Amino acid sequence: MFRKFVIMLVLSLLVAAGISQASSASRVCIIGAGYSGLATARYLQDYGLNYTIFEATPNIGGTWRYDPRVGTDEDGIPIYSSNYKNLRVNSPVDLMTYHGYEFQEGTRSFISGNCFYKYMKSFVRHFGLMENIQVRSLVTWVQRTEDKWNLTYMKTDTRKNYTEECDFVVVASGEFSTPKIPHIKGQEEYKGKTMHSHDYKEAESFRGQRVLVIGAGPSGLDVVMQLSNITSKLVHSQHILKSWHIFNQPDFPGNFISKPNVKHFTANGAVFEDDTVEEFDMVIYCTGFYYNHPFLSTLSSGITATENYVMPLYQQVVNINQPTMTFVGICKPFFAKLLDQQAHYSAKLAAGHFKLPSQDKMLRHWLEHVQMLREAQFKITDVNSVGPNVDEYFKALHKEAGVPLLPPVYASVFVFSGKTLLEDLQNYREYDYRIISDTQFKKKYNPREEVCPYDD
C-alpha cells in the first residue's frame, strides 16, 4: 500500500505547476480562524506581513467554540465545531498555550473547553488579530496561476463569490469537522437512532436511554464518562483498551457494559465479536474524523488531499510541489504546542527567513519519512504523523527555520499525562502539572473548582 503513495506522488509531479519560492510574501491568505490559523496570524504579524484570515463561520475559535446546534447554522453552513457541554481539555494547559502567551499562574491544568475558548479570544485581543479576520467567508477553491494563488470564497450571508490573489497560502481549516463513520455489517437493519460524536452536545438528552458508544479515543472516553450516570444502560464497544482491566478502571455504575468490536447490527441492537448480544436505543459513533479540503485538487494546487491523508508534505507542513502553500494542524499526534511550532515555521517561510531545500531533496526527505513510518508499524492513514519522536521533530524545525526550540519537558508531559489518562480515567483531570525546568515537571493531585482567569 505504501508503494501507492510513490505512484501518486509521481503523478502529482506531472501536473504540478512548478516551484516558485519567493523570498518574502507580500500577501498571505490563511484558511481558518481556529487554533492553528490564529497562531500563524500572530507570527505573520510579528514579521510585518500583510495577511487575511478567511473564516467560514461568524466566529473565531474553530472547534473550541461550543455551539449547541447541529446540522447547519443561520447561513446554511455546516456546524463545524465538535465541542460539547462540560468539555474539559484532555491535556495539561501548559501543552496548549500559544508561545509567549501562557496561562495565568495558579490555573488548574485541565481547564474547561469554555475557559480555553476565552483564552483564545484574549489572545486575539492581545495581539490585535481581529481586524485581519474576515468571517462568514467560506473558501471554495484555491488555484495556482503562474506565480500567484487565486483564492475564491463565498460570503455565506449574501451567497456572493469573490476571488483574491495571494502570494502565500496557509491551510489551517482543522480536522475535527467531517465525521468518520465506519461501515459495519447490518447497519441498514438497525432501527434505532444513530449519531456521531460531532453532533453530541450534552448528556442530559440521553437520560434513561440505552446507549451504545463505539470508540475509545478522547471523545469516546469523554462521552462514556458523561453518560455513565445518565443512561439506563451504557454499552461501550472498543478495541484500543484491551488491557484496561490492569489499570484503575472507573467505578462505573451497574448499567455499564464493556464490549469488543461490533460484529454486526440487528434490528434492535448488535452482536459483538465475543458473540454476545445487546439491545439499545441509540448508537453514538466516536470514531474520529476525516480530513476535508474540498477547495483543493491535485491539478489546482499540486497537493493530493484525500479524506485520510494530505501529501506530499515536507516536514508535515510544506506542499512540496508548490512550497508557497503550507498546512498547519493536520499532523499527528494532535499536540497544540506542535501546531504552534508549525505555525511559526510557516510564518518564517512566508517571511523569507530561511530557504527550503530543492524539490528533489524535499521529496527524498518525505519518502524517507514514509519509509520510517512503515518500519515503525504506523498505519497508512498515519502518513501525516511526525513520527514516534516528537522531540526530534521540534529539533528539525529549530535547526532548519530557527523556530525556538521547545524544551523536551513538553513532550515528556504529553506522554506522561496520556499514560495517567489510561491509568485513572475517572480522576486524571484532577492532577496539576507544573513545568519547573526544560527537563522536569511536577504532578500533584489537586481537585478543585475552576476559576477561569479570562473574560468573554
From Swiss-Prot:
The lineage of its organism: Eukaryota, Metazoa, Ecdysozoa, Arthropoda, Hexapoda. This is Senecionine N-oxygenase. Its cofactor is FAD. The keyword Flavoprotein applies. GO terms for biological process: alkaloid metabolic process; protein homotetramerization. It is found in: Secreted. One of its GO terms (cellular component) is extracellular region. Transmembrane segments: none annotated. The gene is sno1. It comes from Tyria jacobaeae (Cinnabar moth). Disulfide bonds: none annotated. PANTHER family: DIMETHYLANILINE MONOOXYGENASE (PTHR23023). GO terms for molecular function: flavin adenine dinucleotide binding; N,N-dimethylaniline monooxygenase activity; NADP binding; senecionine N-oxygenase activity. Optimum pH is 7.0. Homotetramer. InterPro entries: FAD/NAD-bd_sf, Flavin_mOase, Flavin_mOase-like, FMO-like. FAD binds at residues 32-37. Residues 1-22 form the signal peptide.
